[in-house]
């Protein structure tokens, strides 16, 4: 028995550094930014079967939102700093950019996925202040998130390859999940190779982070408050990483409409992170969904860019449509640093764009001497959602 215990302890301590969801802001990220979580990349479900069967592992105490044993924080229940309100509002059918951060010392390769559970009654158990879901409820929710998988192939034009560390015919041979590159590749290896971003393009506490960016399509569903679940299955180790972000979905075009009824008030701390969009509602009380009588011709799209800048540098967005200057740096739209802090380098601007428009864009930095610094390739792509009057959207990203 003693040997068994020592072996398990060794499994928990042998490998340092891992990954966590950053855009939209996960509960883990908010815990990190408020100082509660000292290692956001360390919420780990282990030891479990993570490969080649991606769905075999039971989530146990980790649940769909993660448990960090290092700091004894269970992200499956709201706290003062997360879980009381959405951090961003998406629109049904919208294609959005999502991002996670992998630590340089714990890039285990493998595959990852996102999901939205459309059983609001079940999700509400993870939104109720003071209530910790049971392990059975946690597993039921994870099963629901797997059923509500947001497939790579749902986004038109997105490259959805097979994992090079998987063998054809094995359970991991699938391209509905997103894949990292070959674990032992000489260049652009593993998960850090997906973006090819520079070290410290996102923040971890062990060895510095690399961004991993993809696009997902929001389902035909609406909710004042629900969860986006991120899951990464490691190829190298017997580990799974689970994280949740509190989101809202507006403007369902015909899918099930369900509203949270778990609480009528929200608690907001003055030290709460300012890096995320304000919610569109201040209460999660049940309300009737209005019938859409007027389709919006213009949608306010908020561009959020997380980029560290020097004094005198300014950030702009430009792109393939006239509203973004048609790639002219002279006509690029300036972002505001009103919410910028050293730990949360956020630049934002909101632009009214024609509903349904698809375009490419990039962020640029203008130096004090007038020189221009462009983000690395490839161009970003975005499709403005369609919806009722009052629909808004957010395009969030980190500099690359």
Curated annotation (Swiss-Prot):
Catalytic activity: starch + reduced acceptor + O2 = D-glucono-1,5-lactone-terminated malto-oligosaccharides + short-chain malto-oligosaccharides + acceptor + H2O
Sorted UniProt keywords: Carbohydrate metabolism, Copper, Disulfide bond, Glycoprotein, Metal-binding, Methylation, Oxidoreductase, Polysaccharide degradation, Secreted, Signal
Uses in biotechnology: Starch-active PMOs provide an expanded perspective on studies of starch metabolism and may have potential in the food and starch-based biofuel industries.
Pfam families registered for this protein in UniProt: CBM_20, LPMO_10
PROSITE patterns hit by this protein: CBM20 (PS51166)
Residues that, per the record, bind Cu(2+): 18, 108, 241
Signal peptide extent: 1-17
Localization per record: Secreted
Protein name as it appears in the record: AA13 family lytic polysaccharide monooxygenase A
Organism of this sequence: Aspergillus terreus (strain NIH 2624 / FGSC A1156)
